[in-house]
Amino acid sequence: MAKEFSRTRRIAQQLQQELAQVLQRDMKDPRIGFVTVNDVDVSRDLSYAKVFVTFFEEDKAVVQEKLNALISAAPYIRTLVAGRMKLRVMPELRFVYDSSLVEGMRMSNLVSQVINQDKAKQQQFGSADEVLNEDEGATDDTDDTKGKD
């Protein structure tokens, strides 16, 4: 069983590399544009391959158009990749949009915005360390006067 999993993983990795090369070099369809193959998940019997792709577009309508173009070109892409790989049966390609990259960029932008807001507040009101040090200095002065009485 472990050997079978290892083989499917190796095939998935090779398929990902070959798909990336085919989509970058051999595909001349302007509807697809620049596409990144993030991952490939191959079924255990090697009959299907789910291909996770991303586009550098944020508009959902444009992304859907590009995904539809990939889906319609899947049989042609499959024949191009089959010529490069030595498999008895080439898996049927199913393209799926992977939004994890877009979500990661969105989260990174949110974190950057919060950091910038914190820096602006720190410059406006002073840092929390300065406020704490001033408070400690004030308590030390009052403690000294109590000890002298």
From Swiss-Prot:
Pfam families: RBFA. Keywords: Cytoplasm, Ribosome biogenesis. One of its GO terms (molecular function) is ribosomal small subunit binding. The keyword Cytoplasm applies. Residues 125-149 are annotated as: Disordered. Its main location: cytoplasm. One of its GO terms (cellular component) is cytosol. InterPro entries: KH_dom-like_a/b, RbfA, RbfA_dom_sf, Ribosome-bd_factorA_CS. One of its GO terms (biological process) is maturation of SSU-rRNA. It is found in: Cytoplasm. Residues 131-143 have a biased composition (Acidic residues). It comes from the Bacteria. Belongs to the RbfA family. Monomer. Binds 30S ribosomal subunits, but not 50S ribosomal subunits or 70S ribosomes. One of several proteins that assist in the late maturation steps of the functional core of the 30S ribosomal subunit. Associates with free 30S ribosomal subunits (but not with 30S subunits that are part of 70S ribosomes or polysomes). Required for efficient processing of 16S rRNA. May interact with the 5'-terminal helix region of 16S rRNA. This is Ribosome-binding factor A. It comes from Shewanella sp. (strain W3-18-1).
